């Protein structure tokens, strides 16, 4: 080891480095069309609780919609089933205890959008598309240069730390109605 290497290893301050890693984006049709009318009614019956003060610059419900409605919770459970099917393992074995921390509804109209953001410590984040109108903007992952144009009844899932956004809805015919949520690993009962 050179003196330079040795001196570098003696540093005590934080260092910042750029890491690039492949991330999984999962797309699944859920076959939950039979719930769409109820889900739309649940979302529309809520107030715009967030008032465009979050990254979502569109109508947005309370953060914990899944705790208020069994139909919404059914979508959350479908998302958890997808995570369980991945058979993730660590040194303790298969990780199979997950929970929905938060879930909300959003309605995007003309000129609505979502700013670039992550979902912090969430293991997985997802968006379920209840209604996707003609010319709706994609879910955009800038770092990967990936534009995902969703379909009705599709759930798109990605790691919570991945930066994503929704570009401004220009010339969109109708409204895009979604549920979104975050899944965490449940260490409480391991």
What are these regions (language model features)?
Residues 91-168, 173-190:
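Catalytic core of non-heme Fe(II) oxygenases with the double-stranded beta-helix
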């Amino acid at each position: 080891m050179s003196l330079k290497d040795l001196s570098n290893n003696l540093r005590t301050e934080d260092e910042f480095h750029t890491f690039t890693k492949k991330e999984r984006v999962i797309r699944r049709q859920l076959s939950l069309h039979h719930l769409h009318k109820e889900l739309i009614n649940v979302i529309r019956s809520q107030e715009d609780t967030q008032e465009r003060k979050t990254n979502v610059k569109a109508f947005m419900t309370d953060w914990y919609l899944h705790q208020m409605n069994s139909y919404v919770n059914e979508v959350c459970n479908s998302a958890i089933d997808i995570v369980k099917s991945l058979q993730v393992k660590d040194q303790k074995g298969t990780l199979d205890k997950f929970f929905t921390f938060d879930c909300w509804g959003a309605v995007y109209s003309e000129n609505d959008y979502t700013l670039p953001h992550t979902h912090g410590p969430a293991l997985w984040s997802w968006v379920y598309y209840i209604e996707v109108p003609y010319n709706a903007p994609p879910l955009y992952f800038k770092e990967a240069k990936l534009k995902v144009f969703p379909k009705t009844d599709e759930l798109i899932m990605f790691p919570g730390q991945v930066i994503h956004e929704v570009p401004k809805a220009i010339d969109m015919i109708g409204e895009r109605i979604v549920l979104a949520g975050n899944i965490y690993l449940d260490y409480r009962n391991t």
